Amino acid sequence: MALLDFFLSRKKNTANIAKERLQIIVAERRRMDTEPQYLPKLKKEIFQVICKYIKINPEKIKIQLDQTNKNISILELNVTLSE
């Protein structure tokens, strides 16, 4: 009986993992659908300005727009600088 429980409990864990991954994908797509049209150009221009003054790997720059509600948007910029 314990052997059967072992195999059945694994399926539940796999299903939960798949569900969590799907929720992440759906949330990311929703976020991308609500991005303003100007955001990709803004990201590119911010990146160009940073690269003008600092030699940096493009993967070290993260730009994200968060909306807390309909009236407030937060532009978050994270730059990891090497020493």
Swiss-Prot record:
Name under which the protein is recorded: Cell division topological specificity factor
SUPFAM superfamilies per record: Cell division protein MinE topological specificity domain
NCBIfam families in UniProt: minE, PRK00296.1
Entries under HAMAP family matching the protein: MinE
Gene name linked to the record: minE
Keywords noted in UniProt: Cell cycle, Cell division
BP-aspect Gene Ontology terms: cell division; regulation of division septum assembly
Domain of life: Bacteria
Family: Belongs to the MinE family.
Function: Prevents the cell division inhibition by proteins MinC and MinD at internal division sites while permitting inhibition at polar sites. This ensures cell division at the proper site by restricting the formation of a division septum at the midpoint of the long axis of the cell.
Alphabetized InterPro entries for the sequence: MinE, MinE_sf
